[in-house]
Design a protein with these regions (language model features):
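Peripheral interaction segments used for macromolecular assembly
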Residues: 1-156
C-alpha cells in the first residue's frame, strides 16, 4: 500500500493517512476533518467495524468484516477478517486481509479493497472452524505479498 497524506484525493472524497508510523497506514477516504463529537474516524472501537461492508474500487460488494485481529506484542492492527459468500454465516469463506491493504470510506461507511472478485476468490482463505496460525511468519508474509501490502511488523 502506498501511504497518503492529508489532501490526497482517492476515488471519491479525501484520503487522510492515519497511524503512528510512516509507511503502513490505514487510509481514510471521505471527510478530511471530522466535525462530529467523539473519537472517530481516526480512533474507533473495534466492534464498531465488525459487520462493515467491504467493496472494491468499482463499488462491488466483496464481503463484510467479521473480526479485527490485533498484534498484541506490537500494539498494531494486523488484519481484518472478511467473510465472503454464504448465508447467515453458513457456507461463507473467511479471508485475513492486511489492515494496510484496505481504506476506510467514512462517507459510504465501508472499507475499500483494491481487488476484483476473482482475485479475492483465489486469495488464501479459511473456514470458521479452521483458522490459520496467523502468528506464523511464513503465513503472514505470504498474505501480505498476495495483497501487495508491506508487512506492518517491518515498521518497527
Amino acid at each position: 500500500m502506498q501511504t497518503t497524506t492529508t489532501g490526497t484525493t482517492l476515488g471519491t472524497g479525501t484520503a487522510t493517512g492515519v497511524g503512528t508510523t510512516a509507511g503502513v497506514r490505514m487510509r481514510i477516504i471521505g471527510r478530511a476533518d471530522s466535525d462530529s463529537a467523539g473519537p472517530g474516524p481516526e480512533l474507533m472501537a473495534a466492534d464498531t467495524l465488525e459487520g462493515d461492508r467491504v467493496v472494491n474500487l468499482n463499488g462491488e460488494d466483496l464481503g463484510k468484516i467479521t473480526d479485527i485481529m490485533l498484534d498484541v506484542q506490537r500494539g498494531r492492527i494486523a488484519y481484518a477478517v472478511m467473510s465472503v459468500g454464504g448465508f447467515l454465516g453458513i457456507g461463507d469463506k473467511l479471508f485475513a486481509v492486511p489492515w494496510s491493504a484496505m481504506s476506510l470510506d467514512v462517507d459510504r461507511k465501508c472499507f475499500v479493497l483494491d481487488a476484483n472478485k476473482d482475485r479475492l476468490e483465489a486469495a488464501p482463505g479459511f473456514d470458521k472452524d479452521s483458522w490459520p496460525t496467523m502468528a506464523d511468519p511464513t503465513w503472514a508474509q505470504s498474505v501480505h505479498e498476495y495483497y501487495g501490502s508491506r508487512p506492518y511488523w517491518e515498521e518497527y
